[in-house]
């Protein structure tokens, strides 16, 4: 699966941007006011730039997608829930047969 550049949730267009690194050093963010998911291609760990794998980028996309979806539903998804859901979605795509 490839990360989309744009998609709709609740009839709102969400733009996806891949950047080299976020100032926060997070893997990704969702900005509900600007309707943008931003995904970092790298993070800094112990003063070392670590390039994220395709799997990590996809997992981050789904994590932020869950936050975007929940914003339009009830805005109460915790980081742990978003991470769990994104893990399950990635596992579905990685292990499907046929």
Label each PLM-derived region with a short phrase:
Residues 12-14:
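Well-ordered beta-strand scaffold positions
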């Amino acid at each position: 699966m490839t990360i989309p550049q744009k998609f709709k949730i609740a009839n709102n267009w969400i733009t996806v941007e891949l950047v080299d690194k976020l100032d926060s050093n997070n893997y990704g963010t969702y900005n509900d006011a600007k309707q943008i998911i931003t995904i970092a291609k790298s993070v800094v760990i112990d003063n070392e730039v670590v390039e994220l794998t395709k799997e990590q980028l996809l997992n981050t996309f789904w994590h932020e997608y869950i936050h975007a979806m929940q914003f339009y539903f009830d805005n109460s998804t915790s980081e742990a829930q978003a991470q769990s859901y994104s893990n399950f979605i990635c596992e579905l795509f990685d292990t499907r047969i046929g």
